[in-house]
Amino acid sequence: MFYIIWLVVVLSYEVVVVGGGHAGCEAAAAAARVGAKTLLITHKIGSIGEMSCNPAIGGVAKGVVVREVDALDGLMGQAIDKASIHSTILNQSKGPAVWGPRAQADRDAYRTAMQDIVLGYKNLEVLEASVIDFSTDNEAGSPCVASVTLSCGKVLHTRRLVLATGTFLGGMIHVGRDKGIPAGRMGDKPSTRLAKALCAHGFMLGRLKTGTPPRIDRSSIDWSATAEQKGDLVPTPFSFLSDAIVLPQVSCYITHTNTKTHEIVRNNLHLAASCASLVDVAAPRYCPSIEEKVRRFPEHKSHQVFLEPEGLDSNSVYPNGVSTSCPIDVQLEMLRSIRGLENVRMLRHGYTVEYNFVDPRELHHTLETKKIKGLYFAGQINGTTGYEEAAGQGIVAGANAALSLSQNHAPFVLKRSEAYIGVMIDDLVTLGTSEPYRLFTSRAEYRLRLRSDNADMRLTEMGYNAGLVSERRFGVLYNKKQEMDRLVEELHRTSITPHTLSKCGIFISQNGEKKTAFELLGHPSITMDILIQLWPSLNSFSRAALAAVGIEGKYAPYLQRQAADIQSFLEEENASIPADIRYSEVHGLSKEAQEKLQRAQPFSIGAARRIPGITPAAIANIIIHLRCRGRASHQNS
C-alpha cells in the first residue's frame, strides 16, 4: 500500500531527500537510521526503486559497493536478494580481490521490494511532489539550507537537504534527429526549475548523457540461435543478512552483432542523436552505444549482445550491448540483422538522455557542498553512472546530513583504504570528472583489502559507532568475528612438517620447519578444503567462517606488506590542511598550482597530492608552510 502525505500546514523536517532512485532511497533510509526526522520527496511514489536502464545489480567493483552499502545497513542488497533471477560471481577464475557479485533482477520484484522497505521505514515519510527551489539563511555568516519549495507552492522547512535527482535534472531525451523531449526517463517529466534554482544559487552546471537499448519481445527471439549463459549453481546473496535467494533462477543468452549490423549503423550515424551535434556532451566511456562502438572500433567484426530477461512473468528482454539513439526504424533494422533476432519485435525503442550535473569538486568528502551548508548531492548529479555508485553516495550523503545536525557527532567519511565508496568519493571531490564516472577495481590502490567477502568486517562496526547500523546487524557481525577468531586460533595452534605433508601428496619447501595450518593457506596450491582433509575437526566450523578465513589466510602475507603502505597513506590523510589557508601565501607555489588548490580546497596533504598537476615540489612547499604556521601559532600562544 502506498502512503501519500497531504500537506495542509507548514511542516518541518530535519532532513529532506529529493529523488526516489537508488541514491535517494539510500540517503533517506540512512538519515532515518541515524535518527533524523526525514522526508523523501519523489515525483511518483510508484517509481521508487525503478531500474531505469539495465535490470541488474553488481558486477566487478560495483558488486563490492553493494556489499559495502549492505554492511552499513543499506537497502540495495536486501532488495536485490528478493528479486534476483540470475546470480553469478564474475572473475571466479581470478583471486577473491576482483570477484564481482552480480545479479539479474526481476524489475517488478526489485521495485516492489524497495518500495516495501522504504514505505515502512521508521523515521521516514514519503511525499509525492516536485521540488522546484530551496532557500537559505545565514548561519555564522555562511548560507545554510532553510526550506524547499514545491511546485504546488507549499514550503517545507528543513535544516538539511539531499539532492539525488538522477537524470531528471534538466533531463532531455533524444531519438534520431527529432527534437528532444524534456524528460528524465521515458514518460517522466524532468526537474527543469530545480536546475535553474541551482544556477541561481551559484552552482555551475555541466551536461552529461547516457543511453538505453530497445526492449524486445521474448516470444519473437530464436533462442536456438543463441548461446545459453547459466548462473551459478548455488546463487550467492548480496546481503550479509540473507540466507538464500528466494526466486527461481533463469538463464541469460548471448548473441553477436555482425558486419551487416555495423553497416546499418555506419550508414545511419548521421541520423543518430548520440553522434550528431544534437547531444554534444560526454557519454559513459565504458558503456558505449552501438554507434560509438562502430565508430571507435572499426576493426571489430562483432560485439557481444547479452539477452537478459526483465522478469519471470515479463515478456520483455533487455539486449545489453546495443544502446542506441538511432531513429526507430533504424533500430529495428539493426536488431533484425543480429543472429537469433531476425524476426524480433521491439516493445520499446532505445534513446539517449542528457542531463545536468554539478562539478563534484564543489563538495566535501561528506558530500556536503562547499557553497551552502546543509546541502548535499548524491548520485548522477555528481557525475557518476550506475545504480551501485549512486547507492554508495546516497548512504554517505544521508548519514552525514543527519549526523551534522548535532555537534556531538563526527562526520562519516570513508577513506580510500577502507572502502570502494571511499575511493569513488575521493576521486570525485579531488579530481572531478568530465565524463560519467564508473568504478573499477583498478581505481583502488588497496583492492586486496577491499573485497566483497569482507565488506562487513571492514565497515559494519564503523557504521554501528556512527549510529548507522542496527543492533541486529552488529550482533550478526559480532558472532561471525567470534567464530572466525576461534578458527584462526585453531589454525595457528595446528602445525605440520613438510615431510608429513609430502606423504599426503602435498609438496612445499622441504626445509624441515613446521608450518602452521594458517601459514599453509598462504601457499598457492593449498586451500581450506585441503586443510579440512588434513584436519577433519575443522568441519565443526561453519562454511561461512571457513570460507572467510580461507581468503584472509590466502592474502595474509600480502596484506601484511600492504599495511605499511596504508599507514603511510593514513599519515598523509591525517596531515590536515586548514580550511582558511591562503595558497597565495605559500612560498614557491606557481599561479596554476594556487588556482587548482584554491578550487579543490583539499582537506589533507594526501588529497592535495592527488590533484592533477600538483607536483611533489608543491606538496613540499605546502608542508613547509604549515610547519612554519604551526610554529608561529605555538609561539603566539
UniProtKB/Swiss-Prot annotation:
Its main location: cytoplasm. FAD binds at G19, G20, G21, H22, A23, G24, V131, S191, Q380. Keywords: Cytoplasm, FAD, Flavoprotein, NAD, tRNA processing. NAD(+) binds at residues 283-297. One of its GO terms (cellular component) is cytosol. The keyword DNA repair does not apply. It is found in: Cytoplasm. Its cofactor is FAD. GO terms for biological process: tRNA methylation; tRNA wobble uridine modification. It holds the Pfam family GIDA. Transmembrane segments: none annotated. Belongs to the MnmG family. PANTHER family: GLUCOSE INHIBITED DIVISION PROTEIN A, PROTEIN MTO1 HOMOLOG, MITOCHONDRIAL. NAD-binding protein involved in the addition of a carboxymethylaminomethyl (cmnm) group at the wobble position (U34) of certain tRNAs, forming tRNA-cmnm(5)s(2)U34. HAMAP family: MnmG_GidA. This is tRNA uridine 5-carboxymethylaminomethyl modification enzyme MnmG. It comes from Anaplasma marginale (strain Florida). The lineage of its organism: Bacteria, Pseudomonadati, Pseudomonadota, Alphaproteobacteria, Rickettsiales. The gene is mnmG.
